[in-house]
Amino acid sequence: RLLFTFNCRRFNNLEEIDEFAPDLVINAATVKYTIEAFNKVLPHLPEKCILSDIASVKTGLPEFYAKCGHPFVSTHPMFGPTFASLSNLSNENAIIIAESDHLGKVFFKDLYNELHLHIEEYTFSQHDETIAYSLSIPFASTLVFAGCMKHQDAPGTTFKRHLMIANGLMSEDDYLLSEILFNPHTSGQLEKIQAKLSQLQVIVENHDSEAMKHYLEEVRNNLK
């Protein structure tokens, strides 16, 4: 069925890879098993086969690629089935790692362009910094919201939207959430959240209307 419907072939054992001799292997294993999956197939791959991962967490991958003896291409589609509309990805983004093999980058640029994704090229280091900002901040903020919430019989629209995001986040794999939050750059982002919360708390406790006005103006400017 896979062969005739999707032009795919399912292998029943690793030895079938030897005969197939792929030019590119895309690793779609969960973050916890990405490197383990690579190690299992490596003995069966041609020397020039390009290794590819689409992992959201790149921990350990630069070191693995440096010693694996194969060209590689590492990318990160910045969306998932929880919130993205997979039938329309024109508003979604993808990152291609700059250190990747040229041919591998060309392949994924063509693929992501066909999906109408916006593409950015970052180094491994820049990717980690970006993830700390774009994932760790909303993840941490959502966890704080969910950690403080209690059941509401008549929730407002804003609460329901936050609740929907929280439920979506908590449906993700615990290991994935942990690894994203354990990003070395996350701690600095959490400090910024704490600083802003402390500032807001002082304003609220003092009923300082002028300070609140400036605070809200600053937030609106950040959203531009």
Predicted features along the sequence, with ranges:
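NAD(P)-binding Rossmann-fold cofactor-contacting core
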Residues: 1-16
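Rossmann-like NAD(P)-binding element
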Residues: 15-42
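Short, basic, helix/turn surface patches
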Residues: 16, 39, 100-107, 145-156
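Redox-cofactor binding/interface segments in oxidoreductases and associated redox assembly factors
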Residues: 25-27, 52-53, 96
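Short, conserved loop/helix-junction motifs that constitute active-site signature segments
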Residues: 42-48, 88-89
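ADP-ribose/adenylate-binding Rossmann-like module
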Residues: 45-61
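Rossmann-fold dinucleotide-binding core
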Residues: 57-122, 128
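An accessory alpha-helical subdomain
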Residues: 121-224
